[in-house]
Amino acid sequence: PMTSSGAIDYDAYGRLIDWQIESGVAGLVTCGTTGEASTMTAEEHRQTIAFAVKRAAGRVPVIAGTGANCTEKAVELTRFACAAGADACLVVTPYYNKATQRGLIAHYTAIADASDKPVILYNVPSRTGCNLLPETCAALAGHPRIVAVKEASGNISQIVSLFHKAEAHLDVYSGNDDQIVPILAMGGEGCISVLSNVLPKEAVRLCELFFSGDVRGAAALQCRLLPVIDALFSEVNPIPVKAALAKMGYGTDTLRLPLTPMEEGRRAVLLNALKAWGV
């Protein structure tokens, strides 16, 4: 969350962290896509990681977003996160420069070599212009500190191939809230969720239903949540989630350019969808 002047609102962020933990989430990700890391300065990025680790105080694991499109920068940030006490690092594929698959292997290997904590690969080609292929994940799975992948390609055929080629060596987490149950059904371990920012108990419940064996119940809950999920992605993430959190008392809907506040018509749809869940 940010103040109306665009400064990071650590009071609101601390309260958000506490609420997430009290709602039963299994872990926290700081400085990811939803955390607006792309518009933070290097110092803010470090401060926010350190703050999240301190605020969580060991209650749940903290995963730090440490990706960059420069390998050296990603290595430096990963080393900082490890030293600051993060439990793992979430590393998005390099964006804009569009590395080859061979380049991705070299990039992630360098980061994992520099880390003393587990590394989670993050594939979101719609945002990065770079697709981490299943065979590349399988190759990277041989590194002892590369343990999982957040899969947000949205391509179910590719995700099936990922399970076929790499599941034995990598945990797979859903990175798309509308595909949580399908990915869990293929063997996924959980989700790294945007939805959980605003409905954490429901996101936790969805996974609990699935892992308790109530697959139909989990699927039904996923379908009931779709109006909220769709509204949260009706504009580029994190624009809608920040609008929702501002309404809930966690900071303002201020974003740093080039992101701008949510269009009023879409905001109304989002807030109306949340009302159905008592928000």
Locate predicted features.
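Glycine-rich phosphate-binding "P-loop"
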Residues: 123, 145-146, 256-257
